[in-house]
Amino acid sequence: MNSDATSKTYTSSTLKQNNHITKDMKYYILFGPPGAGKGTQATAMVEKYNLHHISTGALLRKEIAAGTELGLQAKALIEKGCLVPDEVVEGMIESEFKTVTGVDGFLLDGFPRTLPQAEALDAILAKTGEAVTATVSILIPDAMIMERIKGRALKEGRADDASEDIINNRIVTYHNQTEPLIEYYEKVEKYHEIDGIGTIEEVQGRIFDVMDKF
């Protein structure tokens, strides 16, 4: 990953090409349906806890903007509300782990979304004796998901948010493929639910209350 592609929430000096993952790092996972405000909350979490934000959406958008073969394939799937193949996403995630230093941990946003991805993440971290620290799941009702995404589409003119059919497909995809992860992480006592209804500050406070425990 090149320094010019880093997020504004951390400087390029934190990124170095290497093959070493520092021990005792924190690995947080942020869950939530589309429209739950994950992007806003992720920014606050990264800044407060000195984390490297790994967003599969951002990684894929970079490929799409570059017009790569992966980007073109991903664009077609995303526009239909479908998920990108696991092996592609997993490779990008592991690559991110290997290029970052100078932070206290990682915040994964948009990964894992399925049980196979969760198992793959465990396997990736196990290579260096690491494990997921905790998962934070922002919960909002389906009706609110639809309302928020449609409102965002009107303000930003986002083509992928303009169709109710696509929005419904994204909601169904989230429930069918992502929610089984609840049981997976509950079994190891790493699942934490956050009420996503309220102001940004209220939701943020609930998230910080959980993360402060680690």
Give residue ranges: language-model regions.
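Glycine-rich phosphate-binding loop of ATP-dependent small-molecule kinases
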Residues: M1-F214
